[in-house]
Amino acid sequence: FKATTSSIHQFDLPFHYLGQILDTSFEYSSEPALLPLGERSGYQHLYLEGVGQASDGIATFSWMNDNKFYTITSAVAETDSLLLTRLGANDPDFNLRRDPAFIIRRRSSGDTLFASIIEPHGSYDRVTESAVDSSSHVLNLTVIRDGTDYTAVTFELTSGETKFFAMANNNADPNTVHTLSIDSVEYQWAGPYLYAER
């Protein structure tokens, strides 16, 4: 998700999910009392349940839903806050589902980029009470280019492979040929994006 602006803003990127939190790469603290996250723009309907702080360049958030495992791996800045919220604040008639969300909050930012991988992996068998492939396969995620025309990331997998993803920010024509040079390596492709080995 890329946002451009002519002034400084706070950006929140929410991931709404169903299920149970299994693991995070960051420490978080639970809020002692459930209070709304804000006063308007929908924030008045979100309870703030917990807050964590980004630290090492990536944040991972894993959960299980319907006996399947999922992980979000996000490239984050050390100043980003990681919020755990739940829908349902200021809802006296219980019209809202009490669904949880994971929010990456970036304060005092101009143009900004949120790079994330949402990964389904593995399953849980209730009959044998065993989990298969319950851990993420993504080791890291790095933004290596974020410009006006192109954005590019790399990510390393537990298999040892490194993947490369580049996107043309201003031209989604499937026939346009793009050329991008990064670290003395030239990438060329047609269409809005390139997904390749690195």
Spans of model-derived segments:
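Non-catalytic terminal regions with compositionally biased, polar/charged low complexity
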Residues: 101-113, 118-198
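Acidic (Asp/Glu-rich), glycine- and aromatic
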Residues: 3-33
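Short, hydrophobic/aromatic-enriched beta-strand segments in well-ordered soluble domains
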Residues: 15-17, 71-76, 80, 84-87, ...
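Trp/Gly-enriched beta-strand surface patches
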Residues: 33-98
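Extended repeat-based interaction scaffolds and adjacent low-complexity, acidic/S/T/P-biased segments
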Residues: 11-16, 39-42, 47, 57, ...
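Non-cytosolic beta-sheet module surface loops
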Residues: 2-5, 106-108
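Short, surface-exposed linear segments at secondary-structure transitions and domain or protein termini
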Residues: 20-26, 81-84, 94, 169-182
